[in-house]
A protein has these predicted regions:
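C-terminal catalytic domain of Rieske-type non-heme iron oxygenases
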Residues: 16, 93-275
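Rieske [2Fe-2S] iron-sulfur-binding domain
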Residues: 1-113, 163, 183
Length: 275
């Protein structure tokens, strides 16, 4: 489901990715159950077959003299595969935006980690929670108990009301949260919001949090994609700008720390504990 529409996505036998209406134009059977064969998706009910553009290719239950497949077409959306993610555009054809070229989409595949997870809330609620920094003094307090870097151990506890500064940009905004530390030092954390649904974290260096376990510098972020008014799919990405790619152990750690590992999710990407 995407923006309230029930769609089916598939990669045909030629490697092309299609995204189209889930239901067959004939009797509205779900194409999620369809057979992916010879350049198209065939409905299991009466065998109507569609290509990645939604064009009907075959109507085996229709007599040759009444075959009208040329007049049948499902609603379909254009797709592009960039950075290991399938992107689509669902708006007016005359306003198609350029393809995304964030740095994480341009690095080799083994330098990035991707995951996704379904959140049962509106996408804007999820986005607001992600870019909110003030909650960390309470919600994430326990995460700093074992920190080893001097000066950072108690900053959540000692400065629970950070000073927030917002900087408007042409892509959205950046805001910083500044917390006072002992000995007249400050801890400054910045988030980037890139319209319409991206959050960028600051670079993670190898002294605290998950980066310490990776031993590599990383940048990470989230995309909050609306499924409908009550559900969103959160895409999590991390990439390293180190000389060496992410190892198998790095990817396992990121799977546990960011989003959820695959064994913690149901088939529709819900967390198991939320079933």
């Amino acid at each position: 489901k995407l923006l309230g529409e029930k769609l089916v996505a598939f990669r045909d036998t030629e490697g092309r990715v299609g995204l189209m209406d889930e239901f067959c134009a004939h009797r509205r059977a779900s194409l999620f159950l369809g057979r992916n064969e010879e350049g198209g998706l065939r409905c299991v009910y009466h065998g109507w077959k569609y290509d990645t553009k939604g064009i009907c290719l075959d109507m085996p239950n229709e007599p040759a003299e009444t075959n009208f497949k040329h007049a049948v077409r499902l609603k379909a959306y254009p797709t592009a595969e960039v950075g290991g993610v399938i992107w689509t555009y669902m708006g007016p054809a005359e306003k198609v935006p350029p393809l995304p070229k964030f740095e994480w989409t341009q690095v080799p595949q083994n330098y990035r980690h991707l995951s996704k997870m379904r959140q049962e809330c509106n996408w804007l609620q999820a986005l607001e929670g992600a870019i909110d920094n003030a909650h960390a003094g309470f919600l994430h307090r326990a995460l700093t108990d074992k920190t080893t870097r001097a000066g950072l151990r108690g900053y959540w506890e000692n400065s629970q009301a950070p000073r927030l500064d917002v900087h408007i940009t042409d892509y959205g905004f950046m805001y910083t949260a500044t917390r006072a530390l002992p000995e007249r030092e400050n801890y400054v954390r910045a988030y980037q919001y890139v319209m319409p649904f991206h959050q960028f974290f600051p670079s993670q260096i190898a002294h605290s949090g998950s980066a310490a376990k990776l031993k590599k510098p990383t940048v990470r972020g989230h995309m909050f994609v609306p499924m409908d008014d009550e559900n969103s799919m959160v895409y999590n990405w991390t990439y390293t700008f180190a000389d060496q790619p992410l190892s198998e152990a790095d990817n396992e750690q990121l799977g546990r720390h960011i989003g959820s590992a695959s064994d913690e999710l149901t088939a529709d990407f819900r967390k198991l504990r939320n079933r």
